[in-house]
Design a protein with these regions (language model features):
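Single-stranded nucleic acid-binding surfaces, predominantly the OB-fold ssDNA-binding core
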Residues: 1-137
Length: 137
């Protein structure tokens, strides 16, 4: 195996709240369960089944793109849950905007990061960019 070998990493995307004085920060980690040599195609894919746990926030970007921010609670063993921020685009944005808290959803997307400015500082947000979403009854 060379230094530039493509690898597939699979596992769980987890969240932890970290206290910083009076504030909480949501830290996101990949809990790796396995690593194998990958094929040729680049792929950044995450599949989630969870619940909408915060009121969806719908808006339009300055370029007119429809987006909805959601927070998905994904249950795991031992009565623990991970809270994963996600962003829905276009028709998924319209669907997500109408979903009440507690709705069970299945999503497929990718993990992404983006830079934003808050106050005087530049920050990085990590989120799941949802390509497909369906409500599970």
């Amino acid at each position: 195996m060379s230094v530039r070998t493509r690898m597939t990493i699979f596992g769980e995307y987890r969240s932890y709240n970290e206290k910083d004085g009076e504030r909480n920060h949501l830290k996101l980690y990949v809990f790796v369960k396995g690593i194998s040599e990958a094929g040729e195609a680049d792929q950044n894919r995450i599949d989630l089944i969870g619940y909408i746990c915060k009121q969806p926030l719908y808006r339009e970007t300055p370029l007119g793109k429809e987006i909805t921010d959601i927070l998905i609670a994904v249950n795991r063993k031992h009565r623990k849950s991970d809270y994963l921020p996600a962003i829905c685009w276009y028709s998924n944005a319209r669907l997500a905007a109408e979903l009440p808290v507690g709705t069970k959803v299945r999503t497929m997307g990718m993990i992404q990061s983006r830079i934003y400015v808050k106050g005087d500082s530049e920050r990085t947000a990590y989120e799941v960019s949802i390509r497909e979403m369906e409500v599970i009854e």
